[in-house]
Amino acid sequence: MTNKYIGRFAPSPSGPLHAGSLVAAMASYLDAKAHQGQWLVRIEDIDETRTVADATTAIMDALAVFGMQHDGEVVVQSQRKDLYQAAFERLKDLVYPCGCTRREIADSRLGVAADGAAIYPGTCRHGLAAGKTARTWRVRVPDANENNEAINFDDRWLGPLTQHLASEVGDFVLKRADGFWAYQLAVVVDDADQEVTHIVRGTDLLESTGRQIYLQRMLGFPTPHYMHVPVVLNDVGEKLSKQTGALALDLAHPMDELMKAARFLELSLPPVNSITEFWRVAIAAWARRFAQE
């Protein structure tokens, strides 16, 4: 890893930005600016079933209101399917077709991963059962007794972490039953193609990190530095999202929204009178905590 810094904010266009997504955007923006680096924006619409019309425009307009200027072109995942296909073909010795339904995997009672998904028991690892047709394509992970099964990484917010793919996830999906590429493959390909060196995102994506590092290694890609910041919760302790009733940000009062997000990220800032001044003091405060890492 060189001294250059390329970070990114990668929202899904499933609705307008809310308080939780502003925290993620702010953390990634502050970290990039504190390191005198680039801050990219990527629209992660690989799951086209969740895409909301005009959401991308609304997201970009909101970032502009908050004074967050991106570097380079905005990359859109749905326009990059050839790259994902090429990466999939490079993994041909590790991937296999799977005919299992979600119910069948859940009924295996092998357990549930930290992100709520059932751990895959390896049913189709050695071939499809009689009468089964391929629904998804999975990538084989190392067995629990193999030396490279444990994925170790240093998280810049949480410290040293280890994920065991065999026992915590199992072989995971690269191509979905509906024909769309899985998030894990798309994000790894995009980060490598855009030369992303630092990933700052919410802890809701922490459980994906082991899978992504594994794919990076199998594809010969460099592994970025990771930081997983706390996520905003709703009144009943659920991650704030469009699905849990998150309200759109108040673009008429951007300073109020920025200050709330900064407080959530444990930044103690003096009163400011403009968005430009907010970013000046916020970047300086973030740099004092993280710019030497």
From Swiss-Prot:
Record-linked InterPro entries: Glu-Q_tRNA(Asp)_Synthase, Glu/Gln-tRNA-synth, Glu/Gln-tRNA-synth_Ib_cat-dom, GluQ/Sye, Rossmann-like_a/b/a_fold
Presence of keyword Metal-binding: yes
GO biological process, one term: glutamyl-tRNA aminoacylation
Cofactor note: Binds 1 zinc ion per subunit.
Annotated keywords: Aminoacyl-tRNA synthetase, ATP-binding, Ligase, Metal-binding, Nucleotide-binding, Zinc
Obligatory cofactor(s): Zn(2+)
Binding site for ATP: K242
Residues reported in the UniProt entry to bind Zn(2+): C98, C100, Y120, C124
PANTHER family membership: GLUTAMATE--TRNA LIGASE, GLUTAMYL-Q TRNA(ASP) SYNTHETASE
Family statement drawn from the similarity comment of this UniProt entry: Belongs to the class-I aminoacyl-tRNA synthetase family. GluQ subfamily.
Protein name per the record: Glutamyl-Q tRNA(Asp) synthetase
Gene responsible for this protein: gluQ
